[in-house]
Amino acid sequence: MLSLSNLQNIIYNPTIPYVSTITEQLKPGSLIVIRGHVPKDSERFQVDFQHGNSLKPRADVAFHFNPRFKRSNCIVCNTLTNEKWGWEEITHDMPFRKEKSFEIVIMVLKNKFHVAVNGKHILLYAHRINPEKIDTLGIFGKVNIHSIGFRFSSDLQSMETSTLGLTQISKENIQKSGKLHLSLPFEARLNASMGPGRTVVVKGEVNTNATSFNVDLVAGRSRDIALHLNPRLNVKAFVRNSFLQDAWGEEERNITCFPFSSGMYFEMIIYCDVREFKVAVNGVHSLEYKHRFKDLSSIDTLAVDGDIRLLDVRSW
């Protein structure tokens, strides 16, 4: 779950129906986190991102997110423009259960919304109304909401990508004006060597027909790979390994829930602890990997390749 300390303008235990102004403009990179509980007798509830709050005529709804429990047991998404609904997009992979708590994380991307529930990617919804017009959040139906939080971010996909805390190595990766993402294969040197307390963040978007990609922490001088993270979407395996003294070690694959799917936006956080690396994806802890390469201070390079659009890399 995302820490509340990372969110702004948190509203606790709002009364439903809930309609309120969103205090800042929603731009790509903005995040909305809604935590709540589905009552036993709920038939449906909805989360609406609106342009205004007018009842007559009814305000436009840029994104209507509507879990339904009676008969259909699905999520219906739609857009309301000039009091007319568009075509429904229906998701049958239903993550909500009656009498169970939930966490909805909605990420605003340049061309679509990305929705995850309880740490699992659920759906993508292409913008039919410019998200910058959204100024109101509405929640309706039979649902108990514990908290609503926001994280307003800069436009990750239209600004020139930054690489805070890294120095790019490959000439082809040097940013050109107007470029929306980093070229692959990507390689960059950390401005400070790896060690306990250090963090690396990789942000990207998985390609639609992705097979796999990899994120590696490398000891530049020896070219040993201390940490090889290799999500394989074709088999839903999150493979971890090390390449030491010109040989791969034993793969680690155990994971509770595979956190990636085609088309999704992700933020991968790699935290170096004394005994292990800890990895989280979109705010949800995924795995630990015990250090096989013991000289942590020799780890000075980040390498990324595979079937993704690489948007941002950071280290501190």
Curated annotation (Swiss-Prot):
Domain Galectin intervals: 18-151, 186-316
GO cellular component terms listed in the entry, alphabetical order: cytoplasm; cytoplasmic vesicle; cytosol
Any GO BP: cellular response to virus
UniProt keyword Cytoplasm, yes or no: yes
Residues annotated to bind a beta-D-galactoside: 248-254
Role description: Beta-galactoside-binding lectin that acts as a sensor of membrane damage caused by infection and restricts the proliferation of infecting pathogens by targeting them for autophagy. Detects membrane rupture by binding beta-galactoside ligands located on the lumenal side of the endosome membrane; these ligands becoming exposed to the cytoplasm following rupture. Restricts infection by initiating autophagy via interaction with CALCOCO2/NDP52. Required to restrict infection of bacterial invasion such as S.typhimurium. Also required to restrict infection of Picornaviridae viruses.
Protein name, per record: Galectin-8
Organism: Rattus norvegicus (Rat)
Gene behind this protein: Lgals8
